[in-house]
């Protein structure tokens, strides 16, 4: 369901409105330029993208509050969420969660919990123009959730929230191949693309990541914590979670700055080690240690041109 506080849709088609390569080129500055024709710097908008499978407890939901607090503290502009189960799984419950982690007026798409056992979703403070689920034939309890987001400026963002299988690298490679084909078939050329979430990858060189690298950047440097640990499962031993952006969006990447700290390639958020934790309020030091906490959140920041 796509909700911007009121309306809903489960299978909206992609739209060319505001998106595509031509839209990026018919303004006052050429693609890749950092200045206007008169030499003035391009006006830019800060964009924070957060991915996280932060469900906790025995029922793969957010009801215990730990994941909700982490998302809230990170102040994401676009959140790629997995295992998006809230309360009684009603639209009202999801709306309350969205307003808590993102704020009043934020939009979201959630794969219908009545259909999907562990749905993916996208939450954003920007308008969602179209959204839906692309079929993932490898699994029945979630698909590839996507949304076309109307960012400030001439280029739209196509955000895809994914949760790949744990059954093996071969299966994940197949899922990646299918998703790349779907993006190539459905996303207008020149659009920003971000694919993020719980890939369940065992290492950074799995075939799935090589496949994704044809449309989004999967190369180092990677988001990490202050100790330079870029692993994202709860024991912090494997790189399960990713925020992967298309080259035209990566051209605008900037360090993630929270409080007095700056993380040049992005941040892996583990409340057990993040200090000072007050920077992530209302998150608590104990949140990432919650029972059955799935993984750590991943954050990347961008400064996108608005003209």
What is each of the regions a protein language model found here?
Residues 185-194, 201-307:
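Metal-dependent phosphoester-hydrolase catalytic domains
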Residues 43-49, 74-79, 102-107, 127-129, ...:
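Loop/turn elements at helix/coil->beta-strand transitions in domains of secreted/extracellular proteins
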Residues 85-156, 164:
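Structured beta-strand-rich core segments of catalytic domains in phosphoester-bond hydrolases
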Residues 63-67, 80, 90-97, 119, ...:
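Stable alpha-helical elements in mature extracytoplasmic
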Residues 2-41:
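Ser/Thr-rich, Pro/Gly/Ala-heavy low-complexity intrinsically disordered linkers and tails
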Residues 59-61, 87-93, 118-119, 131-132, ...:
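Extracytoplasmic/secreted cell-surface and envelope-processing proteins
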Residues 46-57, 130-134, 156-166:
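Active-site-proximal beta-strand elements of phosphoester/diester hydrolases
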Residues 47-54, 70-92, 159, 179-210, ...:
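Active-site beta-strand/loop signature of hydrolases that rely on acidic residues for catalysis
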